[in-house]
């Protein structure tokens, strides 16, 4: 076997007359990766188009704003090719706000349930759950759902629901009579 090839395989192309043939690593490419809160929460596969190429990307669950997802070998041309660096940008969510690992949202509670207590349905990033409303719950009260927040290195954060009391927009005559009776009883007591 040719000794020149043998030494190039052992020590690289820079020895024994291989100068100038050394290849360079391709440049890393940076691109923005906009994600919904649900996509960032659950993770999964996503196909993105960067520089005219479609690339399949694995998104880890619980990825954060500003995190960088590296896709090896999908950057600029070279030997070896550079990497593709995708910088995560979380899109605004219509319901939830993320702070650290905790999520915040508003929970609409009908007035009768706020007064006497009961159960209402609340949304989480994993789907709906039933929340127990204690009697005489005031507007603005924060209810904490442990472990229903965002995943992170120290486990899951919490979901904080701020109570917003709602009153019915339409009443049947019977319901209106009951509300009037309730108002009379309240004013008689005051």
Regions found by a protein language model. Give the residues of each.
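Non-catalytic interaction modules of co-chaperones and other macromolecular assembly/maintenance factors
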Residues: 1-190
